[in-house]
Design a protein with these regions (language model features):
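N-terminal "domain-start" segment that seeds a small globular fold
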Residues: 18-39
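Proline/glycine-enriched tight loop/beta-turn segments at coil->beta junctions
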Residues: 40-46
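Structural microenvironment flanking redox-active thiols in thiol-disulfide oxidoreductases
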Residues: 57-111
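Sec-dependent N-terminal signal peptides
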Residues: 4-14
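Amphipathic alpha-helical repeat scaffolds
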Residues: 50-54
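Conserved hydrophobic packing residues within short motifs/helices of P-loop NTPase cores
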Residues: 46-49, 79
């Protein structure tokens, strides 16, 4: 019986360390061939933001960056996801990455 309980508890303890299926996703980093598994942020508060560099709300990059800088040490992360759905984003990822870092100093993860 003791052996059975040890095996069962080991089974459940391994599952406790598994990443949530929702986060267990590889995302390609903007303007890079590198990928990042979102399980890295499993214990973080995550804000996913759909962004566009030529949108009327582009100025919000500055506020997002300030928010990220203020709370990132407290397990908070912003994940930026550029969208070309409304033709308000640069056509190349290189241009998007350069714009975000040059104009707004964005250093939160972008995919």
């Amino acid at each position: 019986m003791k052996k059975f309980l040890v095996i069962v508890s080991l089974f459940f303890s391994f599952n406790a360390f598994a990443c949530n299926d929702l986060l267990d996703t590889e995302m390609r980093i903007l303007d890079s061939s590198e990928t990042l598994n979102l399980c890295e942020y499993e214990n973080n508060v995550i804000l996913v933001v759909n962004v566009a560099s030529r949108c009327g709300y582009t100025y919000q990059y500055a506020s997002l960056q300030k928010l990220y800088e203020r709370y990132r040490e407290n397990d908070f992360v912003i994940l930026g996801v550029p969208s070309r759905d409304f033709m308000q984003e640069y056509s190349s990822e290189e241009d998007v990455a350069e714009f975000c870092s040059t104009e707004y100093g964005v250093n939160f993860p972008m995919f």
